[in-house]
Every structure is written in structure tokens, then in C-alpha cells.
Amino acid sequence: EIGLRHPLRVVLGDLATSPTVRRMHLPPLSESAVRTLAAGTDFDPVELHRQTGGNPFFVTEVLAAGGQGIPLTVRDAVLARAARLPSAVRAVLDAAAVIGAYAETDLLSQVVGAEVGAVEDAVAGGMLLPKDNGYAFRHELARQTILDALSPTRRVTLHRAVLQALRAVGTGPDDLARLAHHAEEAGDREAVLAYAPAAARRASSLGARREAAAQYERALRFAEDLDPLERVVLLEGFALEAYHTDQMER
């Protein structure tokens, strides 16, 4: 078995673009078309359309794989396209994948530096799309593939950079969950214990109790050495939110 960044991945993906292969342009499938294709399966057609962007190849490959993660054929195609791009552009893709489904322009610039040209090249290369005041991957599966291909060290480093950049560009109450996520992925215990409980309280105040429970649970994963009284506060918060969302078995 070969790794996600093995050179053979490029070869496998390039086979689909060989001059000896007849290429046909297919427009994205509509949500209705995806629903028809997914009929009789356990797939949520709306979620499938969101993840694939309606890309016919992605849709059919995901359905054929039966929900067993991202199909290798999709991974090969995405990684082959990324491998052909300059290293500066690949760095942009790595950062955008870690930032999430949507990467604000100023945040992305903070993480990768003032590489405006590299961001534009990522768009020209068909990997990113301009969206509002930032960028998004053309397909969520492409973002997840790039994210999965990162080494553990690279991923942690980028999450730390994103966390630092979020603090630098300024955040508000609605960013607490995002900060908590990147703090956890960066392994920053102090930041998790600062942001996750605050994110839980914010979610609870908005009636998002399941999200609140998840944030308390996130904090508790880093609370082993916390002062007993502070840990009790987290446990009580989690218990209350779990009760309201019928998750007491957890």
C-alpha cells in the first residue's frame, strides 16, 4: 500500500488525463440529480451534493464506495492535481484545508504570508474558488483529501498558525467554537480550556445545546490536571447539556 504523498499517486491520477484518454466535459450535477442517483442508498443526498459539489466523478465514486471514506480514485485525482502546482500554491492549499470550509482572505494571508499570487494560482489551478471575502475549495472532498494527506507534524503546525492568526485578525463570540477547535488540534491545553467552556456557554445561550455539550466534552478531554473545583464546573455544564439533549448515556 502506498502513502497519500507517494509519487505513484501522481501517476495514478495522471492516467485519467492522458492524451490517449478521451475527455468529456460534464457540468456539475444538480441536487435533484444527486438525489436520484442516491435513491435506495443510506446517503443523505443534500450532504453528498455539498461534499462533492455535484462533480459527477466524485458523486459516482462515493456512491460506489458505499460510504467507506473518501474513495482512493478521488484521492488520487485530487492529489495529482495538487502535486502539479508549485510548492507555494500547495502551501496555500494546506493552510486553506486546515482553516476549514471557508478561509477568509486576511486569515489565509496571515497563515501563509503575503503570497497573493500563490492564492490566485490556487484559484487558476481549479482547486479554490473565490467566495465572499475569502476562498473555499471547489469540492469539500478535495479539502478533506488535502487535509488527510498532511503529516501529523505539519497539521499541528498549521493549526497553531491558524489559532495565532485568528487572535491577530480579531474574533468575536461567534468565533469561540472555531478557536476551541484549532486549539484542540494544535494540542494547546491552555487555549482549549479558555475557549471551549466559553464556546459551550455561547452555544447554550443560543439554544444549541448539542453543540454546547460537545464543547464541554472537548474541555474535559484537557481537564485531567485541572483544579478539582474547576473540573466539577465543566462536568456539571456537560451533564446539564447532555440531559437537555438526551445524551445521558455519555
Feature-to-residue mapping (PLM):
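Sensor-1/coupling segment of RecA-like P-loop NTPase cores
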Residues: 1-25
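Short, structurally constrained coil/turn elements
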Residues: 17-20, 121, 228
